[in-house]
Structure formats: structure tokens, C-alpha cells
Amino acid sequence: MDPETCPCPSGGSCTCADSCKCEGCKCTSCKKSCCSCCPAECEKCAKDCVCKGGEAAEAEAEKCSCCQ
């Protein structure tokens, strides 16, 4: 099954809930278990994390608001 596409691919608020299966979700309101820019072991990433950094940024340069 193909990954779902979020209605806000470039950021912004959307109805991305706990069951979000979007690939590369950039929804600032997404409450997925973890942001793609955070390490898998980051337990603080459970809710309201916001990925900061564009696609052009290096992977190391991407920061998550809950993972400082």
C-alpha cells in the first residue's frame, strides 16, 4: 500500500493524527510517534514536534523542536 500524502506537504497545520502514515510529513501539527528528522531513540518526540530545516539542508542540520 502506498504511503498516504499529507494535505500540507510544504508545512503548515493539518489533521495529521496519531495514526499518520505519511511519508516525509512536514505538517507542523503532526503528532506522529516521531519526526523524520529525529533519531529513533528520541522518546521526547511523541507529540507536537516540529521539524526545522528544509529539504536542501543536510541531515545533520535538521533539528526537531523537541529534540535539542
Swiss-Prot record:
The modification N-acetylmethionine is found at M1. A divalent metal cation 3 binds at C16, C20, C25, C30. A divalent metal cation 1 binds at C6, C8, C22, C25. A divalent metal cation 4 binds at C34, C35, C45, C49. A divalent metal cation 7 binds at C51, C64, C66, C67. Abundant in a subset of astrocytes in the normal human brain, but greatly reduced in the Alzheimer disease (AD) brain. A divalent metal cation 5 binds at C35, C37, C38, C51. The modification Phosphoserine is found at S33. GO terms for biological process: activation of protein kinase B activity; cellular detoxification; cellular response to cadmium ion; cellular response to copper ion; cellular response to hypoxia; cellular response to oxidative stress; cellular response to reactive oxygen species; cellular response to zinc ion. Gene3D superfamilies: Metallothionein Isoform II. A divalent metal cation 2 binds at C8, C14, C16, C27. The keyword Cell cycle does not apply. It holds the Pfam family Metallothio. Residues 31-68 are annotated as: Alpha. PANTHER family: METALLOTHIONEIN (PTHR23299), METALLOTHIONEIN-3 (PTHR23299:SF18). Belongs to the metallothionein superfamily. Type 1 family. This is Metallothionein-3. It comes from Homo sapiens (Human). The gene is MT3.
